[in-house]
Amino acid sequence: MELNTKKKLHALSLAEKIQVLELLDESKMSQSEVARRFQVSQPQISRICKNKEKLLADWCSGTANHERKRKRESKYSGIDEALLCWYHIARAKAWDVTGPMLLHKAKELADIMGQDFVPSIGWLVRWKRRNNVGFGTRQVLVPLFPPEAPPAVLPSQAQPPLSLKDFSPEDVFGCAEVPLLYRAVPGRVFECDRLQVLLCANSRGTEKRRVFVGGLQAAPRCFFGVSSEALPTSYHPDLAIPWSEWLAQFDQDMGQQGRQVALLLASGVVEEWASLPGLHHVRLLPLSASSTTPSLPGSVILAFKAHYRHRLLSKLAAMQSGKEGTSLAEARASITVLDALHMVAAAWAKVPRQLILSSFVQEGLAPGKTPLSLDKDTEMSPVPSGLSQEEFSHFVDLEDEDPGPRVCKEETGTEDSGREEDGFEPLPTKADALQALCTLRRWLECNSASPELFEKFYDCEVEVEQLCCL
């Protein structure tokens, strides 16, 4: 008779856990009865119920390994997700993806993100298991007789194309690429200061996607010490927006939320990306071929650019008044790409929900009967002092002007001028952050700041002090 016998642990795969959830939802069986059926303990069934939402999100993502019993989170989740996006793009282009290619690409992505990471064979094996990835050429047996052609579908039996009426307003999204000269000032335009901004929001204005920005610089000096997750927007080192990568991330996010959404795009773009594999939760809806309306209403784009220009002029004015003798050109040259990303995020957050909702309805891009009436003051950012309404409106659309190539050559590298000899500036310490709080509070005290402003400062002070304690 064996005395020291250990009960063998029986772990359930993801597919079996989904069966457990379905059984509990569809029948009147108790957790104990389900546990006996699957030959596991009742606490294990209880944990499955507790993690129901996460398990369903993994199941719906389309990338999870359904037969895997345990899921370990990757230490380098950012690299993990970026490599998965690249892998889907490569497979969509019918590339023969190999292990060495993935290892090389993972190291390249880690360098771009500023992470000290060296991928190994073991890491690659675990990455493939986590994301249910397999690659390599497969031999396909050619049948002796060609398969019969499927019967033709009569027009009456064909499924009608999806339209806006098939989605709720919260699940209808529009997007637009917006060129932005992030350091432009009235009367001076520099082509080398160009960014490409991708904005996306739903027709209710209740959900704005994280801004995606493409830039000319692969690794700006101002990004030193800042992880990609800490950037206020997503950044891509190229003015050409990687649509397949962005769509794959959008689809993954919607899958985790268990949603089916529509993305409005120009008819030509929809035809180009219709064959993109892996889009399970985002349906591309084409605008009419004769339509000149962008999928994100023009008034929304104009409001975003107006808020950005207003914030830029305020920042330049503060720089000039803060240090005597600072010219407008010097203040403009000190604006970095990182400064621009922060101002882009702030400007996008400033676009009111009511404006987005009204604009979608007015242009017929969302289900609705009558557009909402908005005050003109809420549609545009207030005109900065020193400019007329006409001058500010022209300043907002400076991207339409044609800058000379000579100016672009003169402005190359102005952002990093004066720093090349000393290298990168040292990163601020916790002591520097606390001292900066003291300096800011003292300045507010000496300039008779309002109680409302002090309340905002106190909130910031508490957050910074808590970060310093970590």
Curated annotation (Swiss-Prot):
<feature type="domain" description="DDE-1">
    <location>
        <begin position="167"/>
        <end position="360"/>
    </location>
</feature>
<feature type="domain" description="HTH CENPB-type">
    <location>
        <begin position="67"/>
        <end position="137"/>
    </location>
</feature>
<comment type="similarity">
    <text>Belongs to the tigger transposable element derived protein family.</text>
</comment>
<dbReference type="GO" id="GO:0003677">
    <property type="term" value="F:DNA binding"/>
</dbReference>
<dbReference type="Pfam" id="PF04218">
    <property type="entry name" value="CENP-B_N"/>
</dbReference>
<dbReference type="Pfam" id="PF03221">
    <property type="entry name" value="HTH_Tnp_Tc5"/>
</dbReference>
<dbReference type="Pfam" id="PF03184">
    <property type="entry name" value="DDE_1"/>
</dbReference>
<feature type="compositionally biased region" description="Basic and acidic residues">
    <location>
        <begin position="402"/>
        <end position="421"/>
    </location>
</feature>
<feature type="region of interest" description="Disordered">
    <location>
        <begin position="402"/>
        <end position="426"/>
    </location>
</feature>
<dbReference type="GO" id="GO:0005634">
    <property type="term" value="C:nucleus"/>
</dbReference>
<feature type="domain" description="HTH psq-type">
    <location>
        <begin position="3"/>
        <end position="55"/>
    </location>
</feature>
<dbReference type="InterPro" id="IPR004875">
    <property type="entry name" value="DDE_SF_endonuclease_dom"/>
</dbReference>
<dbReference type="InterPro" id="IPR006600">
    <property type="entry name" value="HTH_CenpB_DNA-bd_dom"/>
</dbReference>
<keyword id="KW-0238">DNA-binding</keyword>
<feature type="DNA-binding region" description="H-T-H motif">
    <location>
        <begin position="31"/>
        <end position="51"/>
    </location>
</feature>
<protein>
    <recommendedName>
        <fullName>Tigger transposable element-derived protein 3</fullName>
    </recommendedName>
</protein>
<feature type="DNA-binding region" description="H-T-H motif">
    <location>
        <begin position="100"/>
        <end position="130"/>
    </location>
</feature>
<dbReference type="InterPro" id="IPR007889">
    <property type="entry name" value="HTH_Psq"/>
</dbReference>
<dbReference type="InterPro" id="IPR009057">
    <property type="entry name" value="Homeodomain-like_sf"/>
</dbReference>
<dbReference type="InterPro" id="IPR050863">
    <property type="entry name" value="CenT-Element_Derived"/>
</dbReference>
<keyword id="KW-0539">Nucleus</keyword>
